[in-house]
Amino acid sequence: MNLRPLHDRVIVKRVENETKTASGIVIPDSAAEKPDQGEVLAVGPGKKNDKGELGAMAVKVGDRVLFGKYSGQTVKVDGDELLVMKEEDLFAVVEK
């Protein structure tokens, strides 16, 4: 199933954090924190300004982004857990 977000929303798939520390200690799932990074899978057309014009989105499909641990609404699509959130809930784009 393909999702097309509306307005200034983006669809993000969480990128799992390392389950092992730098010293080699394995972190159990129960102690691991929710990842706060993800890959943008889909981007809406943008938010309308006061004149009714669409503002350009600052992120694009494929961008790796940072967001709050509790940001967005979780949805399950074809067995994958995805996040739907507004662009303003994103903190930054991770540059490679």
UniProtKB/Swiss-Prot annotation:
Domain of life of the organism encoding this protein: Bacteria
Family classification: Belongs to the GroES chaperonin family.
A molecular-function term among this protein's GO annotations: protein folding chaperone
Name of this protein: Co-chaperonin GroES
Function: Together with the chaperonin GroEL, plays an essential role in assisting protein folding. The GroEL-GroES system forms a nano-cage that allows encapsulation of the non-native substrate proteins and provides a physical environment optimized to promote and accelerate protein folding. GroES binds to the apical surface of the GroEL ring, thereby capping the opening of the GroEL channel.
Xref: InterPro entries: Chaperonin_GroES, Chaperonin_GroES_sf, Chaprnonin_Cpn10_CS, GroES-like_sf
Keyword Nucleotide-binding listed: no
Keyword vocabulary terms for this entry: Chaperone, Cytoplasm
Principal cellular location given in the protein's record: cytoplasm
The protein's assembly and partners: Heptamer of 7 subunits arranged in a ring. Interacts with the chaperonin GroEL.
Localization per Swiss-Prot or TrEMBL: Cytoplasm
CDD domains named in the record: cpn10
GO cellular component: cytoplasm
Pfam family, one: Cpn10
